[in-house]
Amino acid sequence: MRVAILLSMILLFTPGTVADASPMENSYEGNPIVVINLTYESGIGGGDEFQGEIVLELFLNWAPITVTNFVDLVNQSFYDGIYFHRIIDDFVIQSGDPDCKASGVYPVPISDASCGEGGSSETIPFEANANLTHINGAIGMARGLDPDSATSQFYICDGPQHGLDNGNRTQEDDPGYAVFGVVREGIELVQAAAAVPTTNDPDGDGSSPRAPGGPDRPLYEVHINSITIREYVPAPVVENTDVEGLSGLSLSVSALSIILTAIALSRKMNS
């Protein structure tokens, strides 16, 4: 019986083992936090209007080239005023072409053929990291057939899209797409944007299947007002431990103390 009591105390006071979390679930010191401020002004058959902020953490620790490129463009106000030119519900929302800017009235998609083909002047090399995958809300770099052709265009996943991951592509020479961040706040805005009516899905988030091919251009503008750097993830604050917040070492010492006390009491009772 005394052994059972001692084992119970060991289980009670010894900290359990916690599995390592995915790097995309945790924040890391020095990673930039960016904010996409967007607005959707609807029209007839366009669904509900919305506006707000999508907050993302960019993984500088895992994708330094890609993140540095994106942050440099943000600091130049490169993305301000651009609209999301390609939207596929339950897949991605895509933006980042400086030619996709409405001058006055939002352009009629059929006369807007060049939008979606442009980008910034410099390409960056393909950068993949096994820790970064296309989970819901992942942000990645759009590119052409050449893996090293990404410039400024990006997409945000509406739901997990692991078919885009490095190693999951069907073509032998296709390395996939480079993820470099994830949505921390505002995933509901990603979902709302993904559900707007487009040239290939006039009903938006409706029952009609999406027509293949075409630009998947929103019928009404999903406008990026600005993308800004809010902050960089600070170093974790080290607090003094107290009774309600003991460290693993403190718990182990406490457990040992209780066990020794129990043994001493047991010997005294038997003497």
Residue ranges and their predicted role:
Residues 16-245:
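Cyclophilin-like peptidyl-prolyl cis-trans isomerases
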Residues 1-23, 238-271:
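Secretory targeting signatures
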